Curated annotation (Swiss-Prot):
Binds 1 Mg(2+) ion per subunit. The magnesium ion binds only when substrate is bound. Residues 26-160 form the Nudix hydrolase domain. The lineage of its organism: Bacteria, Pseudomonadati, Pseudomonadota, Alphaproteobacteria, Rhodobacterales. Belongs to the IPP isomerase type 1 family. PROSITE patterns: NUDIX (PS51462). This is Isopentenyl-diphosphate Delta-isomerase. The gene is idi. It comes from Ruegeria pomeroyi (strain ATCC 700808 / DSM 15171 / DSS-3). Its main location: cytoplasm. One of its GO terms (molecular function) is isopentenyl-diphosphate delta-isomerase activity. Mn(2+) binds at H22, H28, H64, E108, E110. Catalyzes the 1,3-allylic rearrangement of the homoallylic substrate isopentenyl (IPP) to its highly electrophilic allylic isomer, dimethylallyl diphosphate (DMAPP).
Length: 180
């Protein structure tokens, strides 16, 4: 058995193998983080070895909490594990649910706690090559335009976040300021 994540089975939250949750499309908990510096968002391109959505661009980091782990602890852990980022403490922004086919017979059926981390000052990013093949900073509206033009290059969840939840994730300050 692999990593156990919190998933709902028969309306009860129980530990379930992460791969099984995706194969069966079970509703499960997830965590997503966006790191923002001024008007730019740090995005990552998922490693080619990932079992779903390899090579696609996603938000700064995303994962599933371990069975006994809080969402905020998970957010900090995954910033460190995926990107080598330490000393950044994301703030909780929003809980959302989505359902998306992610290829290879896998389904994301997630209840996601979304966090926003404001980067002030230098940030050392050292991507874990097992998780991330590339990173870049991109302006909010440039990201929207790129997703519109090349949707096949982005994960389903990033497109859902940007198109349906941007106001609650980023707040009006980033969205309005980015237009100026």
């Amino acid at each position: 058995m692999g990593i156990l994540i919190p998933a709902w089975v028969d309306d009860r939250l129980v530990p379930v193998d992460k791969l099984e949750a995706h194969e069966k499309g079970l509703k499960h908990k997830a965590v997503s983080v966006f790191a923002v510096r001024d008007m730019d968002i740090l995005i990552q391109r998922r490693a080619l070895g990932k079992y779903h959505t390899p090579g696609l661009w996603a938000n700064t980091c995303c994962t599933h909490p371990d069975w006994d782990e809080s969402a905020s602890t998970c957010a900090v852990r995954r910033l460190r594990e995926e990107l080598g980022i330490t000393g950044l403490y994301p703030e909780y922004r929003h809980r959302l649910e989505y359902h998306a086919d992610v290829g290879n017979g896998m389904v994301e059926n997630e209840v996601v706690d979304v966090f926003l981390a404001h980067v002030r000052g230098p940030l050392q990013v050292v991507p874990n090559p097992d998780e991330v093949m590339e990173i870049r900073w991109i302006g909010y509206h440039d990201l929207l335009a790129e997703v519109q033009r090349y949707p096949e290059r982005f994960t389903p969840w990033l497109k859902i976040y940007l198109h349906h939840h941007a106001d609650t994730i980023f707040g009006p300050d980033l969205i309005i300021s980015a237009k100026a």
